[in-house]
């Protein structure tokens, strides 16, 4: 989650479905937001919170939002449930925040070796409904996997994310690291994580390179 970004909108009223930010580049379509007040970040100090909104589109600094039901994982009709003041602080969550117990930080194994920030959560989604019939359906998740090529889980198995995907995924294989990740370094003393320029950016990859197999023919 990311906190502290400010609203730049003096007229964000109940029912509004758009709201202007200081910097729209810090958000992505799919983000889940909570709005606080001008003094406090939501969920940390009693500021207005508990109402969630999903970003459905972005135009420079203007976000289009929809109410989000964290229990069902679905959007609902209606805009803001309460007026949001200018300079209100925001708590921003990843689109799949509610699929995991908490944000990724450092795995226990890497921490014990003096490393940090290796942990990742990965979600595989049926983007267009071609597998399940429902676009956006979650196919599988991988919680707490590591960027460290020698990381182990609590059972002593490799926790290196390419190995976990190869061993347990029913839908994908790993091919290469994305450009902003530390490329499979050893865990001892290594600080992992995204590069600074992408610190708030969620990595999304659409699997568009495949083709349907050929139709079966007689041998």
Describe the predicted segments one by one.
Residues 1-219:
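Surface-exposed assembly/interface segments
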């Amino acid at each position: 989650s990311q906190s502290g970004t400010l609203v730049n909108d003096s007229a964000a009223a109940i029912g509004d479905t758009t709201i202007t930010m200081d910097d729209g580049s810090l958000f992505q379509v799919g983000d889940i937001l909570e709005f606080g007040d001008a003094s406090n970040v939501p969920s940390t100090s009693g500021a207005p919170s508990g109402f969630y909104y999903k970003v459905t589109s972005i135009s420079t600094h203007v976000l289009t939002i929809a109410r989000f039901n964290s229990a069902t994982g679905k959007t609902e009709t209606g805009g803001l449930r309460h007026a949001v003041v200018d300079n209100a602080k925001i708590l921003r969550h990843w689109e799949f925040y509610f699929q995991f117990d908490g944000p990724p930080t450092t795995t226990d194994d890497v921490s014990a070796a003096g490393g940090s920030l290796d942990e990742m959560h990965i979600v595989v989604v049926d983007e267009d409904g071609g597998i399940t019939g429902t676009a956006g359906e979650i196919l599988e998740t991988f919680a707490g996997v590591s960027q460290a090529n020698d990381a182990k889980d609590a059972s002593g198995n490799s926790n290196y994310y390419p190995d976990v995907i190869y061993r347990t995924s029913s839908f994908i294989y790993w091919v290469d690291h994305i450009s902003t990740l530390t490329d499979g370094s050893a865990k001892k003393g290594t600080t992992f994580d995204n590069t600074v320029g992408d610190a708030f950016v969620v990595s999304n990859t659409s699997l568009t390179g495949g083709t349907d197999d050929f139709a079966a023919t007689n041998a």
